[in-house]
């Protein structure tokens, strides 16, 4: 982004027209790039561009310099605050001759343990010395300028509508990471982001995050943006900005922090580490509610039980109202993790856990357990069986339910006997009844038949005589025919 005073645009009727740089500005870009050399101070460059400002648009000249400065590496910062160095020097008052000046410098240098004249003004921009000049082509500088200009204008946005034909999931994923407020619509697919101009606080951070998102929007094959900008000092007016598939924009990887540490990231890590048996999915598939696309922050699931999780952080009143309308129409359970500053009363009748700085994962786990217990008590268990041997584990796995739930809802099927953990067909059981398992090794029988044979042997009247902890001899109970 650029300082607002360097933004170049004109207004025609109610539309904002950005003044992008073009190939006609290549000579200027090359000339300014050539001024940035190792060993130079920024103050020297400022003096050298004065004549260029008289020939070219001074805003464009200053913007090029501003961007190139961000790519420079400067001499290391002072080990001592420069203001402290100046305070120590100025204690001695005005100096009238060179020898007295040198004596004072030596005294202060010795006291502070540093080459003070090297750092005395190092906190001033004009005194910063370049140790590594930027390596960038004039073409890339122009594209970067154009992207920065567009980002700067969008900082004044009240609303930004985005149309894309590809990578829309990536855009939404980034938007969530960046904490941007948005609405998604179907037919045609579009996203409506609330702009910084809708906020009364944190506009700087929000605006910068929206600028970061723009880089992902323009990476789509086909994209279009329509923005409503709020401009004017005394009298505010809303103007429109439209742009589609403009090629002279470039994403550059600059040393900047793209994403802040977020509540969402901490929640995801805590959930993964603490809550076992549940699977958490970040950015699940979108849900369509009344032709609006709703993409929850997370989906957590255990078997057939699905719960969507939405983290409500820094939202405006209007955004909350719109979101609530959608949340109430989603048919699956939704858990809302709510920043307590927003007020819980707005979410009456919904599943809400409040948080202050971070989400208490133990409260989430407790809520999920209560929901799971309620679900298991109300779930309708229906199943059929086929084959000779059917285990409860097999049925539970197919139904995505705990074995104990199946056990509480055992069904009786004609032609089958239910033992402790297995259904066995009567025909197969009769066949086994005709076998003689007397004096056989249990270990060998389990290996030949499977684990179910233990329960079958007990049903048929056999007993086990253990020969240690790992094997037993099967003995026919003489009382049983």
UniProtKB/Swiss-Prot annotation:
Residues 414-481 are annotated as: C-terminal domain (CTD). The keyword Cell membrane does not apply. Residues 1-136 are annotated as: N-terminal domain (NTD). GO terms for biological process: DNA repair. GO terms for molecular function: DNA binding; endonuclease activity. Keywords: DNA damage, DNA repair, DNA-binding, Endonuclease, Hydrolase, Nuclease. Pfam families: DUF790 (PF05626). It comes from the Archaea. Residues 158-250 are annotated as: Central domain (CRD). Its EC number is 3.1.-.-. A divalent metal cation binds at residues 265, 297, 310. Its cofactor is a divalent metal cation. InterPro entries: Bax1 (IPR008508). A dual DNA endonuclease probably involved in nucleotide excision repair (NER). The N-terminal nuclease domain (NTD) of the XPB2-Bax1 complex cleaves on one side of a DNA bubble (which presumably mimics DNA damage), while the NUS nuclease domain cleaves the other side, respectively called 5' and 3' nuclease activities. Interaction with XPB blocks the NTD nuclease activity. Binds to and stimulates the ATPase activity (and probably also helicase activity) of XPB2. Increases affinity of XPB2 for forked DNA. Does not stimulate the DNA-dependent activity of XPB1. PANTHER family: DUF790 FAMILY PROTEIN, VNG6129C. Has 4 structural domains; the N-terminus (residues 1-136, NTD) interacts with XPB, the central domain (residues 158-250, CRD), the nuclease domain (residues 260-364, NUS), and the C-terminal domain (residues 414-481, CTD). The CTD (residues 374-481) is not required for DNA-binding. The 2 nuclease domains are found in the NTD and NUS domains. Homodimer in solution, forms a heterodimer with XPB2. Belongs to the Bax1 family. This is Endonuclease Bax1.
